[in-house]
Structure formats: C-alpha cells, structure tokens
C-alpha cells in the first residue's frame, strides 16, 4: 500500500513540476523584450537571445520575420537552385528583402563540383544544369520543378505537408490519401515539407523519435488568424543556443498565436537573411562551419524569399 502511495505521489509531483515549468516558459516568452526593426512597410524583423537557460531550461537564439496580411509591395516566393547555393546567394540573386532556407534536399555528393575520382576517372551525377536536388514537391511560378517520390507507398515526414502561396495569401496544408494531392493545391508556389505542427488552431501529433525530440537548429513557418505570416529560425548546436525539438518549436508557434505552422529543413541548413545586414545579410548563426558565427551557411536547393511584387 505504501509503495503504491509513493508511486502516486511521485507521479503527481513530476506532473506538477513539468506543468509549472511549461507555464514558466510561456510566461518568459510572453514577456520577451524583442529587438524589433521594420525592414519594409508591414514587414518586421524581431530577434532575441534567451540567456541563463531561461527558455526550456536552455539558451536559445531566435529570429523572426512577420509579414502583415494584404501586403501590397512584397510577396513570399519559393525559389530554387539548379544545383546548390547558400540562402544568402539565393536572396541576392532574387533581389530579396529577406529570406529563410526552404525544404529538404539531397546534399552534394559525387558530382562535378566535388571533383571526386575513382581510378583517376571523374565520378559524375546528372548535370547540375538540369537537376534540382529538392527531395520534395516544388512548384515555382506555376512550374513544377521537383516531385515527391513515395517509397513503399508511404510518404516521409518531409512530404506530409505543404506551403501553398497565392498572390494574396499563404496556406499550410496536410497531405491527403491522393497520391497527386500536391498538384491539386491552388498556388503559384508550392513547397512540400514537414512535419505539420499546428493546423486550424489544433496542435498536431508529433512522432516520438530522435528527429523530432532532439534539439537542433530549426527553420519553420506559421500563419496567424489575421493572415500574418511568421518566418522563424532558432539556432542550435552551441552553448549560446541549444536548438529545439519539434514539440518545443510547436509551443513557440502556439505562443506566437499561429493557427498554422510547419517545420522546414533545419540543422546546418537553418539560415535567415535580411537585406542590408552585415555578413551577406545572414542574421542568425548557421552551424555548418561548427562555429557560433554568421559565416557557417550550408548550400541548399531551395528557399523562401520576400521579394518585390
């Protein structure tokens, strides 16, 4: 009897502790003194470095760009590279006001850019001039650049949701049973990614695995009820910023009052650029050089950019 009571009290204590900690985190986030800068009418860049392990019992560095609804002068746009380019290169090439890295892709392997050889002979993949490395459905300006490819009739986590961009709105949608569901989405730009974190104001179930639970740099996009679009990156893999698991990222978007949110490619790909800022516009701390600085960008296959209409 005493053993059962001890177990019961332990369960109650642990539950109460984590509930109190969650409330503390939400209060901390709600009272954040963001560093804010208007980079264009209706477009704000916000950043904050949570120190002293004040958020999720960790240090966290977060950058956010908010795009007000009914934006007249700028639009969100999906762009791709014929091979691989850094997010800042994609931003510059498209005259972007700001940019974040996009969805998942095949990293550079044995292609001409690497000059790999076997027995003295170059080993080549398909030419970078006619091959996009995105491993998700990508539609740009109504042109399909890449397709989702199912394996064993199953979609991978990064193929289970999409961002659909129209002239005046951005939507986040979840996949359907139809194998060609992305083709039916209305939008001049469509980019598949995942997992979906929030849909119609409801938290979506997040798989209990290492990809989702472990802390990494993360890139994601959300949408508020009034139509405001939220682009977010959180740095990681450093003592200055631990990164987040998907459940923690899900909470951040809920606290930002988003009714839709979806994860993008993260890790060493995570990058945000703002035009006119130093370090080629890179404002976060990309990790591909394993240093906590602004110079560790990874080459990526696609990005989300804010460009003039």
Give names to the regions the model predicted.
Residues 1-26:
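Bacterial Sec-dependent N-terminal signal peptides
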